[in-house]
Amino acid sequence: MITLPARPESLSFAPQQSALIVVDMQNAYASQGGYLDLAGFDVSATRPVIDNINTAVAAARAAGMLIIWFQNGWDDQYVEAGGPGSPNYHKSNALKTMRQRPELQGKLLAKGGWDYQLVDELTPQEGDIVLPKPRYSGFFNTPLDSILRSRGIRHLVFTGIATNVCVESTLRDGFFLEYFGIVLEDATHQAGPAFAQQAALFNIETFFGWVSDVESFCHALSPAAPLALAKEKRYA
């Protein structure tokens, strides 16, 4: 059991019964020339976020936490995105951008394409779980809840992009399903102006979960890492 300093109060949990969730660290959201960039959002500050996620992932893996990677997107015909009868069709900025710029059709958030791929600096490893998701929330139309419950996992540590969209949506849905959600604020980035980040973190810390940072997370986990390695050797 570790105790993680967080706002509004510290939270205790067992690393091996917890998961680190990396939300949508795809070229679409973190790279120049990706969907967010093409849609007019600023992605120039994502480099430190990528580095911090790498740090958090390494610490979590050493402590025996499950790592779950999400990739947001759809088939290349966008059937999974929903047609005009779906609010997603009208509100998705990726779909709107492609309607405004037909030359991008089939390129944004399409499975198998560069936009959909995780950034080069972040690579899932054996034992990690990679899940596609068709909407903002990682709980909608995915096996996430089943994966977590079958492993006895109740605490979820969130990183990724965008704090105010997919990260917050997934954490909120987890709250309604009785999961404890923690966001590492310096391992996330918003879609939109800086106040969107602050508003999302305020909502999470006040109503739905807890907010911490990568340094605190790694420091809290450091005593757990040798225990996880010892357990692996014992059962090898």
Swiss-Prot record:
Transmembrane segments: none
Catalysed conversion reaction: (Z)-3-ureidoacrylate + H2O + H(+) = (Z)-3-aminoacrylate + NH4(+) + CO2; (Z)-3-ureidoacrylate + H2O = (Z)-3-aminoacrylate + carbamate + H(+); (Z)-2-methylureidoacrylate + H2O + H(+) = (Z)-2-methylaminoacrylate + NH4(+) + CO2
Gene Ontology MF term list: hydrolase activity, acting on carbon-nitrogen (but not peptide) bonds, in linear amides
SUPFAM superfamilies for this protein: Isochorismatase-like hydrolases
Enzyme nomenclature, EC number: 3.5.1.110
Tagged with keyword Cytoplasm: no
Pfam family, one: Isochorismatase
Enzyme class: hydrolase
Superkingdom classification of source: Bacteria
A single GO BP: nitrogen utilization
Keywords for the protein's UniProt record, in alphabetical order: Hydrolase
InterPro entries associated with the record: Isochorismatase-like_dom, Isochorismatase-like_hydrls, Isochorismatase-like_sf, RutB
Active-site residues (renumbered): 24, 133, 166
Function: Hydrolyzes ureidoacrylate to form aminoacrylate and carbamate. The carbamate hydrolyzes spontaneously, thereby releasing one of the nitrogen atoms of the pyrimidine ring as ammonia and one of its carbon atoms as CO2.
Protein family membership: Belongs to the isochorismatase family. RutB subfamily.
Protein name: Ureidoacrylate amidohydrolase RutB
Protein species of origin: Klebsiella pneumoniae subsp. pneumoniae (strain ATCC 700721 / MGH 78578)
Lineage: Bacteria, Pseudomonadati, Pseudomonadota, Gammaproteobacteria, Enterobacterales
